[in-house]
């Protein structure tokens, strides 16, 4: 897993616990001149012809300084530092890769009287170190949907995490794969009257997708774990061993993941 030293890593650590609040903010469509790139692909080119990517350029530099200071420079816990205030989102998970910071989030579309979550997709905010200091991000509103898994109901797109895998060749980004560990609701479990939550894993050659089911079935279901199987978080130890943590209110479990040169970290 590749990480970038310096400010982006510190920001990634802090952003992993950041809630993104829903005030309109200056926004313009990204152009070829201002769109950043990763692994040789300009973001606005919609890498690998992903029809779900919608691009918005976010510039909060005109906002009061307390709302656009880099993470960690605000005093007091009550000063806001939102990436965006017009997109209902939470459960941020950060990936520092190739000089860019990606903040993946869920997306809640519930109406005020719904009484629960209505989450069917995931998006991502992207910046680099200059953008981070200037308060400028590019927002990709929908990079993946829960129904990309044929076995899933298309709902329950809660907190997930993306992991970059260099396949043992850190100097060559063309070999890199990205794995997205996400909670979704499993059709079979729901039909059986069980808690429907399961963890799926998708893979892509780009952090923006398109994402496809990596194994064609749930990685974990509640019937296997005996707890609500949500909110996966991946950790790679210093020796290269990967652990997938997950859990629910008051309980957390972890499984040791296998590493395969062909399939990546998709089994345990």
What are the functions of these language-model segments?
Residues 1-28:
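Secretory targeting and sorting signals
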Residues 30-268:
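Carbohydrate-active catalytic/glycan-binding domains of CAZyme proteins
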């Amino acid at each position: 897993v590749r990480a970038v030293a310096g400010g982006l890593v510190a920001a990634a650590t802090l952003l992993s616990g950041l809630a993104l609040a829903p005030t309109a903010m200056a926004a313009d469509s990204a152009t070829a001149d201002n769109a950043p790139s990763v692994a040789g692909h300009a973001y606005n080119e919609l890498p690998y012809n992903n029809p779900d990517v919608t691009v918005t350029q976010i510039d909060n530099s005109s906002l009061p300084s307390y709302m656009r200071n880099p993470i960690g420079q605000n005093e007091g816990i009550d000063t806001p530092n939102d990436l965006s205030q017009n997109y209902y989102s939470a459960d941020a998970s950060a990936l520092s890769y190739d000089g860019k910071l990606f903040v993946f989030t869920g997306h809640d579309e519930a109406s005020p009287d719904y009484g629960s979550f209505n989450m069917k997709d995931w998006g991502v905010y992207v910046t680099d170190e200059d953008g981070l200091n200037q308060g400028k991000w590019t927002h990709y509103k929908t990079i993946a949907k829960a129904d990309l898994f044929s076995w899933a109901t298309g709902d329950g797109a809660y907190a997930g995490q993306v992991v970059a895998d260099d396949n043992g060749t850190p100097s060559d980004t063309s070999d890199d794969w990205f794995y997205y560990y996400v909670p979704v609701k499993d059709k079979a479990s729901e039909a059986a009257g069980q808690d429907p939550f399961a963890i799926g894993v998708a893979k892509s050659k780009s952090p923006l997708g398109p994402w496809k089911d990596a194994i064609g079935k749930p990685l974990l279901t509640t019937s296997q774990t005996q707890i609500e199987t949500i909110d996966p978080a991946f950790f790679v130890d210093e020796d290269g061993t990967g652990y997938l943590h997950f859990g629910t209110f008051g309980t957390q479990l972890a499984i040791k993941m296998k590493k395969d040169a062909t399939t990546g970290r998709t089994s345990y």
